[in-house]
Amino acid sequence: MKKFRQIDEGLTWVLEAKSVDDQVGRLKDWASSTQCLVPVVRIGVGAEKVDFGIPEGMPATVKIKEDIPEGMGNTTINLEWRRISGFINPDAPIHNISQARRESVWVQILEGLHHAEAKVLTAVKDGKLLDIYPKLEKMLPTLGITEYNKPKAKRKPKAKKEK
């Protein structure tokens, strides 16, 4: 069983497997040792609709240090899961405080994470995990996830016709 400090490292490892069955096997193996992986994937792909009560995207006030090496963030999504799950549960006390204070707590969580994990957590909050990890989409039917936020297809600009 492989263990990872950061979610982004684990997802990269899962998606390095050649076949979808191997990827699913890796994901299930990893999920058996971490409580937050299943909700992160389900919410991140949009299989579960959750209102975090936070505006979409990375907050403008967040100060994330991009020069920190892998695995060297102050904390991780795993360690912060109790605080993050407060945003997911609609009955949690975090929803009883002002919007500004709630956003401040969210910024504190993001600033403690490694920059790669902060981007993953923001994508999870917005239901756009497939934008960061598009290979994850092939695994979803095998995992029993049929309804999710399909990523927008990137179109190539049409070539201009010459006269």
Please give the residue ranges for each predicted region:
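N-terminal nucleic-acid-engaging modules of covalent nucleotidyltransferase systems
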Residues: 1-163
